[in-house]
């Protein structure tokens, strides 16, 4: 797939994207493929369609909170959506994203990617719970393929209960997760259909509160 084709496909997701951002994302794809030969950054079965399955899928989050400058990605793994978001924030004055990843090798990759791409990302090689008091409440919290919705609420509660909103990417079982999480939590919800996978959604969560008996 040529750079021009990648750029055109990216514009279908983020119409106002610049060529500079597209070039960063293409460079990230190349770096990701190189590191994937040494460490497991993503399921090998998805690498053949890395641009669509991971990069475009992650890129669709940014337009949902494009005015936000302070982001947090938990369980960042191989950089989806964290590094992808950082590529967009690179052209935003004052923009920054914190990436939290407990696996040391993946955190090392994230640091390498952030430096190589010159994007505003701070990488924390730590468990999410250990960062509750260390990372200031962002405007947006993201997570992808990390945990059930209820568990995500527990992990992100200190930030979401302090005014941050969440953009959580979920697959075909999303409605069951929503129903189960409402047992212990109250929250406002907007469901955005995925532009990449018809069975998936992006859950926009705000005003999270833990229910009390």
UniProtKB/Swiss-Prot annotation:
Binding residues for S-adenosyl-L-methionine: 75, 80, 128-129, 144
Pfam family, one: GidB
Record's keyword terms, sorted: Cytoplasm, Methyltransferase, rRNA processing, S-adenosyl-L-methionine, Transferase
GO cellular component: cytosol
Localization, UniProt: Cytoplasm
The UniProt record lists the keyword Transmembrane: no
Domain of life: Bacteria
Record's catalysed reaction(s): guanosine(527) in 16S rRNA + S-adenosyl-L-methionine = N(7)-methylguanosine(527) in 16S rRNA + S-adenosyl-L-homocysteine
Family: Belongs to the methyltransferase superfamily. RNA methyltransferase RsmG family.
GO molecular function, one term: rRNA (guanine-N7-)-methyltransferase activity
NCBIfam families referenced in this protein's UniProt entry, alphabetically: rsmG_gidB
Repeat recorded as keyword: no
Top-tier EC class: transferase
Protein name as annotated: Ribosomal RNA small subunit methyltransferase G
Enzyme Commission numbers on file: 2.1.1.170
Function: Specifically methylates the N7 position of guanine in position 527 of 16S rRNA.
């Amino acid at each position: 797939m040529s750079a021009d084709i990648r750029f055109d496909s990216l514009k279908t997701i983020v119409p106002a994207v610049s060529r500079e951002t597209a070039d960063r994302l293409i460079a990230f794809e190349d770096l990701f493929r190189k590191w994937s030969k040494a460490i497991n950054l993503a399921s090998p079965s998805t690498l053949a369609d890395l641009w669509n399955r991971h990069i475009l899928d992650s890129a669709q989050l940014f337009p949902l909170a494009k005015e936000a400058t302070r982001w947090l990605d938990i369980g960042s793994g191989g950089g989806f959506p964290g590094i992808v978001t950082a590529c967009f924030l690179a052209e935003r004055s004052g923009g920054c994203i914190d990436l939290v990843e407990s696996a040391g090798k993946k955190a090392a990759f994230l640091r390498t990617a952030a430096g190589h791409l010159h994007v505003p990302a701070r990488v924390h090689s730590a468990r999410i719970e250990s960062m509750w008091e260390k990372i200031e409440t962002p405007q947006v919290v993201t997570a992808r393929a990390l945990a059930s919705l209820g568990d995500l609420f527990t992990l992100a509660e200190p930030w979401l209960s302090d005014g941050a909103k969440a953009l959580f990417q979920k697959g075909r079982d999303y409605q069951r997760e929503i129903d189960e999480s409402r047992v212990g939590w109250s929250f406002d919800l907007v469901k955005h259909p995925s532009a990449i996978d018809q069975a998936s959604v992006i859950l926009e969560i705000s005003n999270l509160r833990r229910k009390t008996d």
